[in-house]
């Protein structure tokens, strides 16, 4: 802090150091979610939930974008190209700072997520509030969802070998015949057929 002050930067010292800061973050994450009225945007994969929420944020609504904070889209294929997820503690610090900037007088819109986004765990108090919140459910025709996913995941489609490698994470859940079908459609560049089968087999039943 002294060095920063010497060069003209404003700085403060946290009494108790990092342990004190960390305790404050965890304390805030325990009680802050209950202060807010959450509205959860849900719907099947491919209904553009994340895009809708980001447009809502641009229009001035309060939006808690967990996928952006976690740098992950929240599914097997959700890792962002060329970047890593933050450490759990960094995610929690960013989440805490975001919640502190919200007004309890206005609702917070948030996407339906599992309690784990990639390797990041959603804090239990926030997860409990999400489960109890009112929901807005999106729907879209299957062909519209397929077309959207082909555009939104173009970075994966352009790397078919990497896509097949990612899908090996599902090998234990599905039959060899199913996995072979996925590989066949990928190698044939039949993206409509591949996405349709993946939705029907993996995403929609869950």
Regions found by a protein language model. Name each.
Residues 1-20, 24:
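Thiolate-centered catalytic microenvironments shared by cysteine-dependent enzyme domains
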Residues 2, 120-123, 150:
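Short amphipathic alpha-helical segments
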Residues 12, 39-41, 62-64, 110, ...:
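Hydrophobic/aromatic beta-strand patches that form the interior of the parallel beta-sheet core
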Residues 21-26, 73-78, 145-148:
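Short, charged, surface-exposed secondary-structure boundary motifs
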Residues 29-36:
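Phosphate-binding P-loop
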Residues 37-58:
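Glycine-rich phosphate-binding P-loop
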Residues 58-129:
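Conserved nucleotide-sensing/catalytic segment adjacent to the nucleotide-binding pocket
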Residues 128-135, 139-206:
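Conserved NTP phosphate-binding and transfer environment spanning the P-loop NTPase/kinase superfamily
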């Amino acid at each position: 802090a002294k060095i920063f002050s010497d060069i003209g930067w404003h700085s403060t010292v946290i009494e108790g150091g990092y342990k004190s800061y960390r305790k404050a973050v965890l304390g805030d994450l325990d009680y802050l979610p209950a202060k807010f009225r959450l509205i959860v945007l849900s719907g099947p994969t491919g209904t553009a939930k994340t895009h809708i929420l980001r447009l809502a944020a641009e229009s001035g609504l309060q939006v808690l974008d967990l996928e952006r904070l976690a740098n992950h889209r929240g599914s097997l294929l959700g890792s962002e190209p060329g970047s890593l997820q933050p450490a759990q503690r960094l995610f929690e610090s960013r989440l805490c700072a975001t919640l502190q900037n919200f007004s309890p007088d206005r609702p917070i819109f948030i996407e339906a997520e599992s309690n784990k986004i990639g390797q990041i765990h959603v804090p239990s108090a926030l997860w409990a509030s999400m489960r109890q919140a009112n929901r807005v459910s999106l729907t879209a025709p299957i062909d519209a969802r397929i077309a959207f996913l082909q555009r939104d995941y173009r970075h994966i489609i352009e790397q078919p070998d990497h896509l097949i490698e990612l899908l090996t994470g599902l090998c234990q859940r599905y039959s060899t015949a199913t996995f072979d079908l996925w590989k066949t459609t990928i190698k044939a560049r039949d993206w409509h057929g591949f996405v349709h089968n993946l939705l029907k087999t993996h995403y929609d039943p869950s």
